[in-house]
Structures are given as C-alpha cells and as structure tokens.
Amino acid sequence: MSEDFNPWTHVSSLIERAGHLLQLDEGMIKRIITPERILEVAVPVRMDSGNVEMFTGWRIQHDTSRGPGKGGIRFHQSVNVDEIAALSADMSIKCAVVNIPYGGAKGGVRVDPTTLSPAELERLTRRYAFSIAPVIGPETDIPAPDVNTDPQVMSWIMDTITMLRGYSAPGVVTGKPLAIGGTLGHAGATSLGVTICTLALLKNLARSPENERVIVQGYGKVGSPLVKLLSERGMKVVAVADVKGAIHVPEGIDPDALARHYGEAGTVVGLAGSDTVDSDQFWSVPSDIAIPAALGGVITEKVAETITASVVVEAANGPTTGEGAAVLHERGVPVVPDVLANAGGVVASYFEWAQDLQGYMWEKELFHQRLEKTMHEAFDAIWIRHGELGVNLRETALAVGVERIAEATRLRGLFP
C-alpha cells in the first residue's frame, strides 16, 4: 500500500460508486459519506516517572440512521483521523450488510502501547474513556476491542463510565469478560462467521465441502479457531502461515496437533509431518479456497496473478488491494468480502449488548444458533442481489449496505 494512500478517500469513493450503481441522488450520497460527528480529544497521562505525556484520541460516529454507533477502539502509533473515519464508515456498511440495528463508529488513540506499563495503559484508557464519555453509551455509541485493545481495556472503560454515571453500565462496551457482562460464544464468533460464509458460497457454487483444500494465512484469534472449524466441516486445511513462516501438509493438517504444537513452539513452523513453505510462495500452494485471516493488503496484484485457489474468503480486514481485487475479478475468482465474511464479530457484539440490556444471558447453543441464522440470511441476501445487480460480491455487499442506510435515512427525513 503506497504512502500516499488515503483510507478515507478510498472508502468515500467506494460509497459514491455504490450510490451511483443504485442510482441514488447526489444529496443522499453526500449524506451517507459525511460522518455525523468527529470528536478529537487530548489525552494527558501521568507516566510512572511522574512526567505527564500528551496523546491524541478520536471517536468518530459515521452514521446512526439505523441505530447506535458501533465500532472498536484501537491503540496504535499510526492512528490518525482519516484511518478512524474510514473504519467508522466500514462499520456502517458492515452493520447494514448483516442487518443488525447499528450504525458505524470507530475510535482510537495515537500511542505505541508496547512502551506503556500496565498502570500507564490503564490510566491512558480511563482518561480516554472520560474524554469520550459524552458521546458513548448503550443507546448512542458502543465501543469494542480492536487493535491492541482487549477485554481488560473494555473492563476499564465500562468501570470509568459506571463511576461517571453512578450506575452499572455493562452495555456501554462489548467484548467484556464474562464476569462483568460478557457473553458465551463471543470468542471464535468471527471464525464461525467466516466458516458459515465459506460453506454458503460452496453451496451456491454446487461444490461440496468434503476434501476442499484450504489455505489460511494467520493463526491468531481468527485463524486458530478457523482451522478447526473448517476441518470439522470436512474441508482439508493444507497450509497455514503465521508471522514466523508457513507449513504445508497435502493430506490435511490435524487442527488439534497444530494447536498443541503452536502452544509449545509459538509458531506453526516445525509441526511434525509438515513441509516448510517460503512466505512468498504461500499463496501458490495448490488449494481450492484461500482465506487471508491476518493482515490487510496481502493479496496484491502479483499474489492475485499466482494464487491457485478458485475462491477467496476475506477473514481479515482489507486483505485484498484494489489491484489484487481487479485481477481476481478478471480471473473469475469469487471473493466473499470482509464486510460480510468477518462480520460474525460485530454480530456477536450485538448479541452481547442485547443481553446486557435485557439483563438475561443466553446459553452458548442459542448464541451460535442465532449467529448462524444471521450470517446465513446476510449471505443469502447478498447472493440474490449479486444476481440482480450483475456485479461482483464485493460491489454487491457495498451496494446492499449503502441501500439499507439510504432507506433508513429517507424514512427518518431531515431534522429540523
């Protein structure tokens, strides 16, 4: 991805293109593109040394025509307003694609969290939460974990808002530990959503999952459970990559053996019975389905030209560059876009929020049942519209998301 790439300009152009495909008027397109609120905050933090350091944070609510804002909080040294704005728009589209009653939001602080002590991280989190407190809440905007944030960070945010408001507010964030209002089933929800979309695509292509060869790039929070889920459904995961390298087992990787090995070695490399694959050759491993489940921008034009898989399912956020997507389209390789494929995570957040508001927690079986239903319905709607619009699945998903936002905006009208 080039240094002059602007994520906000890119996302805006995608929404504009979807609007033109739907023949929306320019006024509606501009309303959908323009963020509703951009909050920039100063985040002073007293460091362990006694000095006070200044950081900058943001919370952006892109669109709330369909419900409260929803989107993660990231702590990273590269965070900027254009990135957060683009991600908030992505969340608007994603929530509309899976048809849950949320709009899109995103937040972040420009900081390298690896340089902070645990105490400094807590102070940073609480001060940031205090600064954005006027614009977040169960009925307005519900943050969640993202890059370098986790259930502990969500716990600190929830506690800070609870102290400010004088009553318990578990629904102010999702992705919390079970002990304070988290939900059974949240862990692995993104991976389950990816699996459901993969199976749905195979069904619509009249292909059986049995013995479909899959390669998975990434063995973290998404990739690890994904390998097991795909294997349980009859597919053969023949190659897996992580940051330290990649392995290939033509007859299929034993997911339990891989999990044990990874727990001991900290990498997939070296699994007994596997061949080591150079990272630049990973996408060329003979396969039927390729699933990027780690970084963005990995399926470049060059990779797209050499990838052997006949299907791509995007478990990561933005794993395919514009040039790579164009090549895959030219080659006739269907791609289930990230805005649909990895939406299981935000659906899980919606379920957690609903349980917090009800004060009634579901059993894991009910959680999974409702997640599968939601993802199946979302995929089916995209597939049907894909046939009607005559464009690829990525453009169709964007169009469906924009169409649903436009409908809500039109119905609500303009105040005053």
Which functions belong to the PLM regions below?
Residues 245-335:
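Rossmann-like adenosine-cofactor binding region
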Residues 2-42:
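Short, Gly/Pro- and small/polar-rich lid/capping loops
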Residues 40-113:
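Glycine-rich, N-terminal phosphate-binding loop and its surrounding beta-alpha-beta segment
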Residues 176, 182-286:
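Glycine-rich phosphate/diphosphate-binding loop of Rossmann-like nucleotide-binding domains
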Residues 96-210:
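Glycine/serine-rich phosphate-binding loop and adjoining beta1-alpha1 elements at the start
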